[in-house]
Every structure is written in structure tokens, then in C-alpha cells.
Design a protein with these regions (language model features):
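Short, well-ordered alpha-helical packing segments
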Residues: 12-15, 28, 98
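Positively charged, Gly/Ser-enriched RNA/tRNA-binding surfaces
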Residues: 1, 9, 43-221
Length: 221
């Protein structure tokens, strides 16, 4: 698998430098589709759903598509930040994450800095990530999340930071099935007949017998 990470402060800072901070929601939602569609379609959506001009949308796409090693991308982002405080804070946070995973023994080819990762939801405030299966990248992200400060403010006046993640169980199960990682059936029965009324047990037994005579493996429970 590959973890693709980014930081919302970097994205928000870059938008602020372009005078588009108040247009972050529609722009980031458009960027979130970059892995699923082509850049031209994303650019069209950005200009249609926000006040971004074609020139600004082109600049945004060029910024989020920087390439290289994690270290090289961070160096490029620092130059593009041009001293912008929030952007630099996001870049520094990404450095800490990358250094921390290295210290923890995580294979560095499993952690990729991807500035196009946006996580379209508004509440993310810091590091964000999406996880893809190397053998089945087309299945999409199977685990994603990030940091969100003060999301609990919806329910309490106390300011509380938070980090969350979600697993795509349906995608994981589909991937495991396609890769042959799921065990076969543990029971020979194809049908399970359940009953809750002991007084009608004979009726349920007759149903099971009729089904078995049709060649079906049935278990009564």
C-alpha cells in the first residue's frame, strides 16, 4: 500500500497567496477529483464553481502537481511559499510527519507527499492522507483521514484538537476477494433457515426438507 499525505495549511496558504482563500471549498472539492479525472476537467470545475480565473486555476494545478522525492517536493513548496507563514507551518508539519515515520521504521516508498490530496471536507485543518493499494490502485482510497482542530466546537465551547480516520471496508473486502485473500465458505450450507417459534419447529423442518429435495444444502438454526 501507499500512503499519500498532504497538509491543508499548505493548500490554504497557496490559495491565500492567489487571493482565493475564501474560495477554498469549491476549489479543494474540485482538486479532490484529480485522481479520478483529467486535469482539464478539474480546471473547468474550478473556474465554474469558484471565482478563480483560468490563469489562477492553471497556477493551482501546476502547484499541486509538483513532483520529485518527498524532500525535493518540500524544498519546492518552500520556494513557492515565498515566506507565507501558514504555508510554511504546513510544510514544517509535513517534515515532522515524514521524519517521524522514518524513525518509526516505515518504508519511505510507502509514504508519498502528494500536494493534490485535498480531502474535500471543510473541517480538515492540518495533515491529511489517503491510502491506496499498490496492486489495485483503481479501487480508490481504502483508508483516509487527517487532523481537524475545533470540530467539536459544534457541540461544545471547549476548543479540542482531533485526528480521525475512516476505513473503506467495502473496498477492502472487494480487493481481498479480487486478490484471492478471502477464505471460502466455512459451511457446506447454501441456505440458513432461522426460526423463533418452537411450536412451529415441525413447519420449519418441512421447509428445510422441501428445499433439500430440490438439491439445496440447508441449515436450520
Amino acid at each position: 500500500f501507499t500512503l499519500r499525505i498532504n497538509n491543508r495549511q499548505v493548500l490554504n496558504g497557496l490559495l491565500e497567496q492567489l487571493g482565493l482563500r475564501d474560495q477554498a471549498t469549491p476549489i479543494l472539492r474540485a482538486l479532490d477529483k484529480l485522481a479520478k479525472t483529467d486535469a482539464e476537467t478539474v480546471m473547468e470545475e474550478m473556474t465554474r464553481q469558484s471565482t478563480a480565473t483560468t490563469e489562477q486555476a492553471t497556477k493551482i494545478l501546476s502547484l499541486v502537481q509538483v513532483t520529485g522525492t518527498n524532500g525535493e517536493i518540500l524544498d519546492q513548496l518552500e520556494k513557492l511559499a515565498d515566506g507565507h507563514e501558514a504555508t510554511l507551518e504546513g510544510i514544517e508539519a509535513l517534515r515532522h510527519v515524514i521524519e517521524g515515520t522514518q524513525a518509526a521504521g516505515v518504508a519511505q516508498d510507502a509514504l508519498v507527499l502528494d500536494v493534490s490530496i485535498a480531502r474535500g471536507l471543510d473541517y480538515y485543518t492540518g495533515t491529511i492522507y489517503e491510502t491506496f493499494l499498490n496492486a489495485l490502485p483503481q479501487i480508490g482510497s481504502v483508508c483516509s483521514g487527517g487532523r481537524y482542530d475545533n470540530l467539536t466546537g459544534v457541540y461544545t465551547k471547549q476548543e479540542l484538537p482531533g485526528v480521525g480516520a475512516s476505513l473503506g471496508l467495502d473496498r477492502l473486502l472487494a480487493a481481498m476477494e479480487e486478490l484471492g485473500l478471502l477464505q471460502g465458505h466455512r459451511t457446506p450450507a447454501k441456505l440458513l433457515v432461522t426460526y423463533f417459534d418452537r411450536d412451529r419447529l415441525s413447519d420449519y423442518l418441512r421447509i428445510c426438507t422441501a428445499l433439500r429435495r430440490r438439491g439445496l444444502a440447508v441449515e436450520l438454526f
